[in-house]
């Protein structure tokens, strides 16, 4: 092997082993501050070398350290709804030439402890096991990890069978979990690592009126879904009448 060939092998190996934190921002629901907060939280809570990549339709205000690319088009039939399926574009066989391990994080997660293990935990594909219906295989795609380009058939199958898929699966995470399970590569994060703010942190009424939300033991990432977002957790409020929310100091300390 020549010196140049050896350099090429080393370059390829390095890129195949690099860690990429992926996020996605479209529309106006979440501003650039969510991307920047997420980047800062990852920096504070990992010792692993990583590159942050945001797939977005708006780059204004995003930290220059975050590499931005357009959200790959789903290329669905004209008139088909795309918004609910956008995350699947992270599985394009060639995502802007990116290589390595990809850890996808929703913009509204809050990191509360070291996440090195999310890069090193064994498994070809890891996702949160749905908390509400654990008897199903469906994962929650707020946090998932995979090798970029490792599922080259996922998007072609999605496009070819879209009408059938939209009837069978409620959302992208249901299709994603099913497809990876068909490949015999579906696995889940340890249960304590990713917790729901709604299900695992909020107090039940009447305790919610005088006891603040709790941080679950062993939790590394707190996932927000439903009507409550991180600003609601920091300031209090945001819940429905039957879900009273006091301010959470530990979320305030983490979300910046």
Report each predicted region and the residues it spans:
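N-terminal anchoring/stem segment of glycosyltransferases
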Residues: 2-78, 95-98, 148
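Short, polar loop motifs at secondary-structure junctions
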Residues: 53-61, 111-116, 192, 227-228
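Catalytic core and acceptor-binding pocket of nucleotide-sugar-dependent glycosyltransferases
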Residues: 152-256
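Extracellular/periplasmic catalytic domains that process cell-envelope and extracellular macromolecules
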Residues: 14-15, 136-138, 213-217
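Structural motif
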Residues: 18-20, 101-103, 220
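GT-A fold catalytic core of metal-dependent nucleotide-sugar glycosyltransferases
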Residues: 60-63, 67-74, 86-138, 145-146
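Conserved catalytic core of nucleotide-sugar-dependent glycosyltransferases
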Residues: 115-179
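Short, charged, surface-exposed secondary-structure boundary motifs
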Residues: 31-34, 77-83, 134-143
